[in-house]
Amino acid sequence: MEIDLNADLGEGCGSDEALLDLVTSANIACGWHAGGANAMRDCVRWAVQKGVSIGAHPSFHDPENFGRKEMQLPPGDIYAGVLYQLGALSAIAQAEGGRIAHVKPHGALYNQAARDPTIADAVVSAIHDFDPSLSVFGLANSVFVAAARHAGLVAIEEVFADRGYRADGTLVPRSQPGALIDDEDAVLARTLDMVRERQVRAVTGEWVPLNAQTVCLHGDGPHALAFAKRIRAALETAGIDVIAPGALQAGEDA
């Protein structure tokens, strides 16, 4: 059994280089919700050095709200914004001897694309037109995953170890009770359930089936690094290989 571990990096949380020793895929902020050119370059360089798969983490242009405020934009604006961010990170990756392998939207863009076909299609179209060999990371069982596959892209279904799920497979909004799970032992157990049993218990008690192909490790908490080490160790102890999806790795030629 195999699983990918990914983390959102370049967002000013301070533990990026160390997290890259634990994850197999890095989603690098492209400057619109956090980070900037220097942070992007640092993360790409470290990813190339450590053999971690490089991904773009585009968002709405909303640094004031860390990209977590939902926006209603024309599809053309979303398309252009995603293209813009992919171009920026791709240029830096090329200069550092790597290349982008995947794309994972951030925050509100991620959540809206997961349920809104119009937004999903705009994001997918931008990725496809930029480079149809790129894979996408999206919420397991979501509209976004379906849209990507319909467009011929490889879609990697993502699960969240420390987030609450609703019975329909969507994430509990951060503003609601049960959105974030702080108990580390509970998160470890949930991670193994999602990876081995292909299911997660919703906040209302139901078991929700899902196809876990990559697990997101959040890197923005005070204990994020230590906890990431526990999750990776638990997976390896359970005999699960931690490996990036696909053959395209940072620093390799396609």
Curated annotation (Swiss-Prot):
This is 5-oxoprolinase subunit A. Forms a complex composed of PxpA, PxpB and PxpC. Belongs to the LamB/PxpA family. Keywords: ATP-binding, Hydrolase, Nucleotide-binding. Pfam families: LamB_YcsF. GO terms for molecular function: 5-oxoprolinase (ATP-hydrolyzing) activity; ATP binding. GO terms for biological process: carbohydrate metabolic process. HAMAP family: PxpA. SUPFAM superfamilies: Glycoside hydrolase/deacetylase. It is an enzyme of class 3 (hydrolase). It catalyses: 5-oxo-L-proline + ATP + 2 H2O = L-glutamate + ADP + phosphate + H(+). Its EC number is 3.5.2.9. Catalyzes the cleavage of 5-oxoproline to form L-glutamate coupled to the hydrolysis of ATP to ADP and inorganic phosphate. InterPro entries: Glyco_hydro/deAcase_b/a-brl, LamB/YcsF/PxpA-like. It comes from Burkholderia vietnamiensis (strain G4 / LMG 22486).
